[in-house]
């Protein structure tokens, strides 16, 4: 066995030595041949050495050839050779790969490393393949005119060289790492020749695809056709007749969009060794032009030995021009086909390569008109990348009229083009600048987006469309446009299917749960925005078939799955809150349910007895008999209207059954925006002098909702405290609710008044609107209720109110606090206790001398006269010496809490349709959709109507609709 191994090793060693000897002989033969060819070229150039012997970089021609190095690589790999200038005797280089059938097969291979050690590896080798590189020198026949004949051999620069990686010399142009696969000549130099073949054009080609179509004429091939012409022969061709490839630039690389929400950043798929793409709008195929700062050739490129204006262009193995396939638009340009499988650095990172420059914005926009579909798609994707978080680029795109081009591409027959164009529009529609939104509207962007949503079945396209509409819906003039063109489509294509609601449910099947998809989130956010536009917008949404039903079903599904903190739930609750606004005035047939006075029948019993009877609402011990308890469970004398069929559509908005849904959200959700919207919905439904508001107030008490609301007064979120305080004020119009709230909520209300002066911690500080809302709730509770006034004294509310009047720099806060103090002093039964505590009449008769919000005198037109005091006795009789301050002095109607003039001072509109258009103030969450999208974004400033939830406006009695502010960028990821 050992002898066999020794014999095998010896035979292998002998074979290796034999191969080394062959390569050595081959090397010597090639070197000898190289010298022979160099001498021939030197003799051929001697006649013109005196005038044109200096070429390329200034070196003599013989020296240039002496510097040529033949790089031989290992067997099986390519050989890197350089072409030679054309001489009267044209040379051709070839490489042949052949198999040696005489080489014995072996099952053992030995690899010798550089340090001389030998490693033995057992393999199964059937035959040995070797590569023989040869150089052939042959004469090219010349015609009568002295020009080479076409049939004499392939011209220099043709692609008969097989797999060689060569450098070819071109006339004009620049360092073309990307060459056009085919171009058509203008025909200036060969007017008498036949028309060139019609070669298909391509939007962008890979660097190595260097096939040039042979262009022949009566005079043979012209310069620049892949054949090199000697300097001495160039006079045969007029300089003005030379034709070359278009002096353009390569087309953009293939950019793959990446969703970041409602504004995305798309990164390029460029080659690792290439710079950013240069774009030329006029050509479907073009070479990359030489940068102004130099040619920037590769290190292994040789100096041009023929002409100073020539360029060395690296080529890859060719494909036959006649059989090259057409570019596939869906796969992007051919220039990216060899790179789509791997991600490469972004466009910004390619700037390190000094040879190429990034495309200019006008060039990118011009490519949107390109006849090749992949070019359009790539240009739109690159434009989306440029616009990401760049307001300047967005503004320039509008100024250069790029938005109509993108909108037109939304109806393009190619899905990829539509998708990329919509992605660019999503980023362009996000941001503080509303001019882009207006420009998209002016060029028909909203109808085009709606058409695309109806036709698209690809989920990514639907996300892009709905995200763009979400961004556009933050612009006030666009809200009704979206409703007119897209309400039905958004409802029936997205809201209803994704909510799980079925118009005709199958009794045997289980109800479907809602699907919290990105499309549903974007669509609900868009409807959340448009629902705040005004009375007409609310009417259209209420009457949209299936919308209210689907939203309520989605919320019930969220409560059932205890998934109440996501953005989709927040959007749905905000829509319900907005649609509940002024529901007692705007729904059809509301006049039939109006009441003369608020309150429920049978509430004339004494307040003290009602407080004891209903103490169990807050967990206390009941102090009433079984008969009274049964009467309470039956809503006392409440008589709910009888129905012959189930409520549907907008009727579901004000049914008592929705109270349980809102209370569940208030109990389970930890999303402050959802809490605020749910409390605002109860606030809206409990307002107004109509029968359904009476039922809602009683239902909140029956469903044990008062303790839930009182607990939320401890929230550290200002807007939640404000919404809950106003909801409690509207609920206190029910006398039973007033007694319960006065007994169990007064402590929390007073604590919030103290936080307005000296907050326990920074997050507990309340805004002016919230403080005024709390004070007006206290005023409503203590009015006509001696027991509640006593509760205020026991909670030490008087010192807090007096201090607020004396120290507050807000005239609204001081005035609201003065109203409460005067109401307390009006009860004669309490004056003795107040005087014993050191309070005098002067403390309850304060002048409104407070400063404005920042310490400046208030300019709202208020007088500084002392408010009159109102005396009340236990029976609620009015004093004959003083007039009662009517509720009208506190606001525009019986449910308002702030003077209408004061709201105008703060820049707010009066309650009603005009006030609903007030944009939300204050910081919003950090998302985008203009959150989904610059994903969906930054928090809004006071005047930025960007998307996303934000601080709601101050609500006067009735909850105002939420204007959808900017979406936070945290949701993009």
Swiss-Prot record:
Domain of life: Eukaryota
ARM repeats, residue ranges: 349-388, 391-430, 434-468, 469-509, 527-566, 576-623, 641-681, 694-733, 734-776, 777-821
One of the GO BP terms on file: cell-cell adhesion
Regions of compositional bias (Basic and acidic residues) in chain numbering: 289-303, 872-881
Cellular compartment(s): Cell junction, Adherens junction; Nucleus; Cytoplasm
Annotated segments matching region Disordered: 95-123, 233-254, 267-331, 593-623, 844-926
Protein name as annotated: Splicing regulator ARVCF
Gene Ontology CC annotations of this record: adherens junction; cytoplasm; nucleus; plasma membrane
């Amino acid at each position: 066995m050992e002898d066999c191994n020794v014999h095998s090793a010896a035979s292998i060693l002998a074979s290796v030595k034999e191969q080394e000897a062959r390569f050595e002989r081959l090397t010597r033969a090639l070197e000898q041949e190289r010298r022979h060819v160099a001498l021939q070229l030197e003799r051929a150039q001697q006649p013109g050495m005196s005038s044109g012997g200096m070429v390329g970089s200034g070196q003599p021609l013989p020296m240039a050839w002496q510097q040529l190095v033949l790089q031989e690589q290992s067997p099986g790999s390519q050989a890197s050779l350089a072409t030679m200038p054309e001489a009267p005797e044209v040379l051709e280089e070839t490489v042949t790969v052949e198999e040696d059938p005489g080489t014995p097969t072996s099952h053992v291979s030995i690899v010798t490393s550089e340090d001389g050690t030998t490693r033995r590896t057992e393999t199964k080798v059937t035959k040995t393949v070797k590569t023989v590189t040869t150089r052939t020198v042959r004469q090219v026949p010349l015609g009568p005119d002295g020009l080479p004949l076409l049939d004499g051999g392939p011209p220099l620069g043709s692609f008969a060289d097989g797999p060689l990686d060569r450098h070819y010399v071109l006339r004009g142009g620049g360092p073309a790492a990307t060459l056009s696969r085919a171009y058509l000549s203008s025909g200036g130099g060969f007017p008498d020749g036949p028309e060139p073949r019609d070669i298909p054009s391509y939007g962008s080609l890979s660097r190595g695809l260097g096939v040039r179509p042979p262009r022949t004429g009566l005079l043979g091939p012209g310069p620049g056709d892949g054949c090199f012409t000697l300097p001495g022969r160039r006079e045969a061709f007029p300089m003005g007749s030379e034709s070359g490839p278009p002096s353009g630039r390569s087309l953009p690389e293939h950019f793959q969009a990446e969703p970041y929400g409602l504004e995305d950043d798309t990164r390029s798929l460029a080659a690792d060794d290439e710079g950013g793409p240069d774009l030329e709008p006029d050509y479907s195929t073009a070479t990359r032009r030489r940068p102004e700062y130099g040619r920037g050739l590769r290190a292994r490129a040789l100096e041009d030995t023929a002409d100073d204006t020539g360029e060395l262009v690296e080529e890859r193995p060719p494909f036959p021009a006649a059989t090259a396939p057409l570019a596939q638009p869906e796969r992007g340009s051919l220039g990216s086909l060899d790179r789509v499988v791997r991600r490469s650095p972004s466009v910004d990172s390619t700037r390190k390569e000094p040879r190429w420059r990034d495309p200019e914005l006008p060039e990118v926009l011009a490519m949107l008109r390109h006849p090749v579909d992949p070019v359009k798609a790539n240009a739109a994707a690159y434009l989306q990348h440029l616009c990401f978080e760049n307001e300047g680029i967005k503004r320039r795109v509008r100024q250069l009229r790029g938005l109509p081009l993108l909108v037109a591409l939304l109806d393009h027959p190619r899905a990829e083009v539509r998708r990329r164009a919509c992605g660019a529009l999503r980023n362009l529609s996000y941001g503080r600048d509303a001019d882009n939104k207006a420009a998209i509207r002016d060029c028909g962007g909203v109808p085009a987006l709606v058409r695309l949503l109806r036709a698209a079945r690809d989920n990514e396209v639907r996300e892009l469309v709905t995200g763009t509409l979400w961004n556009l819906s933050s612009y006030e003039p666009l809200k009704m446009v979206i409703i007119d063109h897209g309400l039905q489509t958004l409802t029936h294509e997205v809201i209803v299917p994704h909510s799980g609601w079925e118009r005709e449910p199958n009794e045997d099947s289980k109800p479907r749960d809602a699907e919290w998809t990105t499309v549903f989130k974007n669509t609900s956010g868009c409807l959340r925005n448009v629902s705040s536009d005004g009375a007409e917008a609310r009417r259209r949404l209420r009457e949209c078939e299936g919308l209210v039903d689907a939203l309520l079903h989605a919320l019930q599904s969220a409560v059932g799955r205890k998934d109440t903190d996501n953005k989709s739930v927040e959007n749905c609750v905000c829509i319900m809150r907005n649609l509940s606004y002024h529901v007692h005035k705007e729904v059809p047939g509301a006049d039939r349910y109006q009441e003369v006075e608020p309150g429920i029948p049978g509430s004339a019993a004494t307040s003290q007895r009602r407080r004891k009877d209903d103490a169990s609402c807050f967990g206390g011990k009941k102090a009433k008999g079984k008969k009274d308890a049964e009467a309470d469970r039956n809503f006392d004398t409440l008589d709910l209207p009888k129905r012959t069929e189930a409520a549907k559509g907008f009727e579901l908005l004000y049914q008592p059954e929705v109270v349980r849904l809102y209370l569940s959200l208030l109990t389970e959700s930890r999303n402050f925006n959802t809490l605020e919207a749910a409390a605002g919905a109860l606030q809206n439904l409990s307002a107004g002098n109509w029968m359904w508001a009476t039922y809602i107030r009683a239902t909140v008490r029956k469903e044990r909702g008062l303790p839930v609301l009182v607990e939320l007064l401890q929230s550290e979120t200002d807007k939640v405290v404000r919404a809950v305080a106003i909801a409690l004020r509207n609920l206190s119009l029910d006398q039973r609710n007033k007694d319960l709230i006065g007994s169990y909520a007064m402590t929390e209300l007073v604590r919030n008044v103290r936080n307005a002066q000296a907050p326990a911690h920074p997050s507990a500080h309340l805004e002016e609107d919230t403080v005024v809302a709390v004070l007006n709730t206290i005023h409503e509770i203590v009015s006509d209720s001696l027991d509640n006034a006593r509760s205020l004294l026991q909670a030490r509310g008087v010192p807090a109110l007096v201090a607020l009047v004396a120290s507050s720099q807000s005239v609204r806060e001081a005035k609201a606090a003065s109203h409460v103090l005067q109401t307390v002093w009006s009860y004669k039964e309490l004056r003795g206790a107040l005087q014993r505590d050191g309070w005098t009449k002067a403390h309850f008769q304060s002048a409104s001398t407070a400063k404005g919000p920042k310490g400046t005198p208030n300019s709202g037109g208020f007088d500084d006269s002392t408010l009159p005091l109102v005396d009340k006795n236990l029976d609620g009789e009015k004093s004959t010496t003083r007039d009662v301050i009517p509720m009208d002095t506190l606001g525009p109607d019986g449910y308002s809490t702030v003077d209408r003039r004061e709201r105008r001072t703060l820049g707010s509109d009066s309650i009603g349709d005009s006030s609903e258009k007030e944009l939300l103030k204050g910081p919003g969450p950090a998302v985008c959709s203009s959150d989904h999208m610059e994903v969906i974004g930054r928090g809004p400033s006071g005047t930025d109507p960007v998307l996303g939830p934000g601080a709601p406006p101050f609500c006067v009695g009735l909850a105002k609709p939420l204007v959808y502010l900017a979406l936070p960028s945290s949701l993009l990821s």
